[in-house]
Amino acid sequence: MAIVSSVPLASKSCLHKSLISSIHKLKPFCRTIPTLGMSRPGKYVMPSMSMSSPVSDDGVQRRTGGYHSNLWNDDIIQFLSTPYGEPAYRERGERLIDEVKNMFNSISMEDVEFSPLNDLIQRLWIVDSVERLGIDRHFKNEIKSTLDYVYSYWTQKGIGCGIESVVPDLNSTALGLRTLRLHGYPVSAEVLKHFQNQNGQFACSPSETEGEMRSIVNLYRASLIAFPGEKVMEEAEIFSTKYLKEALQKIPVSSLSREIGDVLEQDWHTNLPRLEARNYIDVFGQDTKDTKLYMKTEKLLELAKLEFNIFQSLQKTELDSLLRWWKDSGFPHITFSRHLHVEYYTLASCIAFEPQHSRFRLGFAKACHVITILDDMYDVFGTIDELELFTAQIKRWDPSATDCLPKYMKRMYMILYDMVNEMSREAETAQGRDTLNYARQAWEDFIDSYMQEAKWIATGYLPTFDEYFENGKVSSGHRVAALQPILTMDIPFPHDILKEVDFPSKLNDLASAILRLRGDTRCYKADRARGEEASCISCYMKDNPGATEEDALSHINAVISDVIKGLNWELLNPNSSVPISSKKHVFDVSRALHYGYKYRDGYSVSNIETKSLVMRTLLESVPF
């Protein structure tokens, strides 16, 4: 019989006594951050999702989307003032990094805290902790050495708590499966079968101890990293989801209950690493009673808090630049569309918060904001004649081509033209080659897909599911949201690597598919109210006479589940010639954009969960 282990995680945290005195003098303070979405303190304006009455613009009858206004004005910058950019904090952070490296390096049989009966789970715990706290970028070499050690003891039945453990352990095996798989080690999910009984249930005790619950938490987390055809992972997800939801109803409110709630909430394909770090900071180490382990969790926790807050000083500079771009480009005069530049910057910061990736964050925010304006222009505001003209002129890629365009289109043409050219120059600096024509082709394909959808709207044509879906993967915008921003990073993307992460790669195809499918399940009713009939739901119903909306949604959700497993495989296939590090940023763009549809259409109704994300990860510092 398999045994269950746990590594205790922590009691109430406070600042380590060695924190330098200058930091004690620099404490953050709480304040209310007003936004344009506030009508009065604590009261938020809910948007109308119905289509507004047609409006006249120079005698042209146009539709509007009925979206709420921009939630953020220039005053947002003053609320990003933070003391954590001062040298004292950075110096303290550097010392903590060295201390945590020593924690990794001190793991040995001579360390009294480790023994051949617990060293594997302890090693996995520290790797998992630094990753969930968002500080793993400092410890790449240490993580690699630690996981190499764990993998050297991996068997077809998994692993025990330590190298001399006689019996495999569910907690160690589940956490090992997840962590090793995410780092590209060839580990099979079949190891989980050794923890199932004849009925397919995973070995559990009636008492539901804390150790057992933590094991099931890691089983659930592992089950989300499933590959196609892994039935045992599906069984593990079903079992662990049910177990943890029932456990939440029984156990008192505690750091464990909060951790379980957070884990259930953080689906792998909508999980944003910076948001996960912010949430995990609140529960990490809250129940630790062992003095030595407590000291270790305190160092990790202090470093995580400092890293989180120090990054906000950089975000202030970047957001100031983004707001100037938004204003100088003339976006305030574009009143028919949604304005989500702050929201997109927040998403970028949640998936790429390494300081050196500034160009990626700003490029992603700009590209996505332009995509949104074009979406509203093609779907709602523009006439079919105007849109055909705009589409044709984009292919000329010449500022003089704007002479024949309406005023609002001239502005959008030049915004797109300048943005693509600017990011191409940045990409040339990073990659050492000119990528402008490559990027132009991607944007032309994207705009062609919008033009196709505009024609469907204008003619009332409802395509087949396959016809709609192939076009919809392009119009999802995933490719143009990811392509130029990743090329500006300090990561080499030679042609042979780029073709494996960009169109027409399987990775790009699946990431685009998820965004189209999930987006349609969240938007189809509102889109229909605005006159956009074509969606995955309506096209499926057309192809399957008699099918209801519920039937269509059930089918599409099943397809999404399969696509997610395929995307996992494309990212983590241990036999791939493309490094995970090259694929991960495209994958993370998928996660960020997918997050916007996690609860609803968070791009049209951005004053609920999306606003909360901005507040929690961009505007609010972590208290010490």
Swiss-Prot record:
Binding site for Mg(2+) 2: D375, D379
Gene Ontology biological-process annotations: diterpenoid biosynthetic process; green leaf volatile biosynthetic process; monoterpenoid biosynthetic process
Cofactor requirements of the protein: Mg(2+); Mn(2+)
Physiological role: Terpene synthase (TPS) involved in the biosynthesis of monoterpene natural products included in conifer oleoresin secretions and volatile emissions; these compounds contribute to biotic and abiotic stress defense against herbivores and pathogens. Catalyzes the conversion of (2E)-geranyl diphosphate (GPP) to (-)-beta-phellandrene.
EC number: 4.2.3.52
The keyword Transit peptide appears for this protein: yes
Family: Belongs to the terpene synthase family. Tpsd subfamily.
GO CC term, one of those recorded: chloroplast
Protein localization: Plastid, Chloroplast
Listed pathway(s): Terpene metabolism; oleoresin biosynthesis
Residues at which Mg(2+) 3 binds: D527
Residue ranges of the motif DDXXD motif: 375-379
InterPro entries: Isoprenoid_synthase_dom_sf (IPR008949), Terpene_cyclase-like_1_C (IPR034741), Terpene_cyclase_plant_C1 (IPR044814), Terpene_synth_N (IPR001906), Terpene_synth_N_sf (IPR036965), Terpene_synthase-like (IPR050148), Terpene_synthase_metal-bd (IPR005630), Terpenoid_cyclase/PrenylTrfase (IPR008930)
Catalytic activity: (2E)-geranyl diphosphate = (-)-beta-phellandrene + diphosphate
Protein name stated in the entry: (-)-beta-phellandrene synthase 1, chloroplastic
